[in-house]
């Protein structure tokens, strides 16, 4: 941290706001586990992600949380970061993104990221949604036909 109290106050504020947003999107359980399992080596990374991504970028005007989730899904598919895709699929559902919209984001990403990435992404997103249903975290709307 800085020796300037104003900078430290700013970091604290961004961290608090970031934790609120991160919990709203990813859930308390995940955030608590990530935060509590951070080591002295990884804690600065958790702080950076929470302050910058969640306390700043996810709070900006211009895109709502649903739009940010769809963008994030496409970007993660391009990176082939499958654990993150599962996490952000949960977040997308929490942000009101429908299964149909998630599926379409995966199909759209398949065209630009390649078939292997798209096939894996389809499996990861479907598995995640089904796990959420099994745990009672999500109820599939009847009219979706999925």
Curated annotation (Swiss-Prot):
UniProt pathway: Mycotoxin biosynthesis
Cofactor: Mg(2+)
Molecular function terms from GO: carboxy-lyase activity; peroxiredoxin activity
Any Pfam family hit: CMD
Highest taxon of the lineage: Eukaryota
Enzyme Commission code: 4.1.1.-
Entries under InterPro entries matching the protein: 4CMD/NDH-1_regulator, AhpD-like, CMD-like
Keywords of this entry: Decarboxylase, Lyase
Enzyme class: lyase
UniProt function note: Nitrosuccinic acid decarboxylase; part of the gene cluster that mediates the biosynthesis of the deadly neurotoxic nitroalkane 3-nitropropanoic acid (3-NPA) that acts as an antimetabolite of succinate and irreversibly inhibits succinate dehydrogenase and disrupts mitochondrial oxidative phosphorylation. NpaB facilitates decarboxylation of nitrosuccinic acid produced by the nitrosuccinic acid synthase npaA to yield the final product of the cluster, the lethal mycotoxin 3-NPA.
Family that this chain belongs to: Belongs to the carboxymuconolactone decarboxylase family.
Protein name: Nitrosuccinic acid decarboxylase npaB
Taxonomic source organism: Aspergillus oryzae (strain ATCC 42149 / RIB 40) (Yellow koji mold)
This protein's encoding gene: npaB
């Amino acid at each position: 941290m800085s020796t300037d109290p104003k900078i430290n106050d700013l970091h604290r504020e961004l961290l608090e706001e970031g934790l609120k947003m991160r919990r709203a999107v990813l859930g308390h359980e995940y955030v608590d586990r990530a935060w509590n399992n951070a080591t002295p080596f990884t804690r600065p990374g958790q702080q950076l992600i929470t302050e910058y991504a969640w306390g700043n970028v996810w709070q900006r005007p211009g895109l709502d949380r649903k739009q940010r989730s769809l963008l994030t899904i496409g970007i993660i598919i391009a990176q082939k970061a499958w654990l993150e895709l599962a996490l952000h699929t949960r977040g997308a559902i929490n942000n009101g993104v429908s299964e149909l919209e998630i599926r379409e984001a995966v199909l759209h990403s398949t065209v630009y990221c390649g078939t292997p990435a798209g096939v894996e992404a389809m499996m990861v997103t479907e598995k995640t949604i089904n796990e959420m249903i099994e745990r009672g975290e999500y109820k599939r709307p009847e009219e979706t036909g999925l």
